[in-house]
Amino acid sequence: MKQHIIPALRLTLACIFFFCGLYSLLILGIAQVSPGKGEGETVSVNGKVVGYALEGQNFSNDQYFWSRPSAVGYNAAGSGGSNKGTTNPDYLKDVTSRIDSFLVHNKSVNKKDIPSELVTASGSGLDPDISRKAAYVQIPRIAKARGMSEDAVQAIVEKHIDHPLLGVMGTEKINVLSLNIDLDRATIK
């Protein structure tokens, strides 16, 4: 029996040393040479941190583009989805509620034209980006709330479209935080 326990303990200790020690130090070292030193990419306006580029946040004012809903209340410490299936009554109630709320604030939009990403939470609950379609459907509400032309708001959206890598890897996306910051800058001018 001793001949089985000692090798098992050695292997356990070696794995703990490697995965809890060396691997963690390796990842920390890689993070230190990356931009932002592993701290996350903060976004500042006038010297004040207003958010993180890779973390979604809640925008509910009609003057701003809205992010994708979060199942975790945009809490980075609790990142994750709701894990409710599409036939779950609670999930359907949440989605229906989001659709109704969206239609109240976006009177010119038909229910069938709402992109699913604006009423369903992402897997992480912290998605910072929306699609071009999700931005376009919000333009009339924002233009009206800010007293801007729809063309002016659309021009700002166009500047914020991140195209797929090499034209094929991924989809077009728009970072909601940077878009809203630029929208504020354009309105202040």
What is the role of each PLM region?
Residues 13, 27, 175-178:
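Hydrophobic side chains within alpha-helical segments
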